[in-house]
Amino acid sequence: MSLADSVLAVNNDLPIRTDSPVHSGKVRSVYWLTDADSRRLIQTKGYNVPEDTPLAIMVISDRISAFDCIFHGEGGLKGIPGKGAALNAISNHWFKLFAENGLADSHILDIPHPFVWIVQKARPIKVEAICRQYITGSMWRAYSKGERVFCGITLPEGLEKDQKLPDLLITPSTKGILTGIPGVPAQDDVNISRSDIEANYQAFGFEKVEDIDLYEKLLKDGFKVIAKALADLDQVFVDTKFEFGYVTDKNGNSKLIYMDEVGTPDSSRIWDGAAYRDGKILENSKEGFRQFLLNHFPDPDILLNKDRMPEREALARDNALPLEAMMDVSRTYTGIAEKVTGAAIPLPANPKADIIKILREEYDLIV
């Protein structure tokens, strides 16, 4: 098996029994199970959900996206070795820690394989729940140009790049394109304020206005749990994005849960603590890959300017990145995952065959 064979790049073609179209995201694909299979698994596996809960198989890939494009490497490498397993392992670890700390549940019911989650269907909150402890990235770029108000929060004068902020900031943005909300443009990833959410809480998917307080508490508490655990590893938790949704429990009550992934190198910035104390930034997240791309291509404006999206898509499609750059990203992802979990990240030679075998023999979901 070659290195390219060990990468799971295409994850929407598995022969999983479903009667719905496969949903393919940038990194994960979701296979909604039939009602009969959902009910069977809930009963035979003992999942603690109502018997009529829709279930899905969520399969992560090793693809890497940045600036809203998928990139590839030399030698037919269509993703990053170990990336998918690393992301899932980190999320699994944090979700377990959240439960131990009495925070909310996640959508994950079962983990059949390092690339696979069995999840319950949730009603998503249409908010990218972003939390920032340091001023860097897009916030710093805007601040350095004179902006002081972010998502309704006014920052003080005199902040410096990469400085720790006086308070943990919640700077939400829209998830998907939302229409008909006063003052909120119908575009993806638009910054919004808490007052925007309060005035239109149902349009953002909240069932009760009081749940805005709960989402902020779960966001801050989750951030603090991860930040403390990373600090013990001499890593700095800089900023992150969480996602939330509602599920119905066995008593028929709605409850807010964590969704998607949490505290990963894809959804967060993580800095090496020793380097930060020396005044340097050593990324243990996808931000390092973004910076590589900005330095690698002669016209970085293509990657930053949303008006040049066709050029950006062509850039990603037509340029194979150096193998060493792809392996640098692999080392970043597997390295931070092994630090966080305390365990080696498995790198199966043929992940697709392994997934099919497990889902056939242990779950009877393969057609």
Curated annotation (Swiss-Prot):
Keyword Ligase: yes
A Pfam family recorded for this sequence: SAICAR_synt
One CC-aspect GO term: cytoplasm
Xref: SUPFAM superfamilies: SAICAR synthase-like
Pathway membership: Purine metabolism; IMP biosynthesis via de novo pathway; 5-amino-1-(5-phospho-D-ribosyl)imidazole-4-carboxamide from 5-amino-1-(5-phospho-D-ribosyl)imidazole-4-carboxylate: step 1/2
GO molecular function, one term: ATP binding
PROSITE patterns xref list: SAICAR_SYNTHETASE_1
Taxonomy, superkingdom: Bacteria
One GO term (biological process): 'de novo' IMP biosynthetic process
Enzyme Commission number(s) of this protein: 6.3.2.6
InterPro entries xref list: SAICAR_synt/ADE2_N, SAICAR_synthase_Vibrio-typ, SAICAR_synthetase_CS
Keywords: ATP-binding, Ligase, Nucleotide-binding, Purine biosynthesis
Catalytic reaction annotation: 5-amino-1-(5-phospho-D-ribosyl)imidazole-4-carboxylate + L-aspartate + ATP = (2S)-2-[5-amino-1-(5-phospho-beta-D-ribosyl)imidazole-4-carboxamido]succinate + ADP + phosphate + 2 H(+)
Similarity comment: family membership: Belongs to the SAICAR synthetase family.
UniProt-recorded name of the protein: Phosphoribosylaminoimidazole-succinocarboxamide synthase
Source organism (scientific name): Shewanella sp. (strain MR-7)
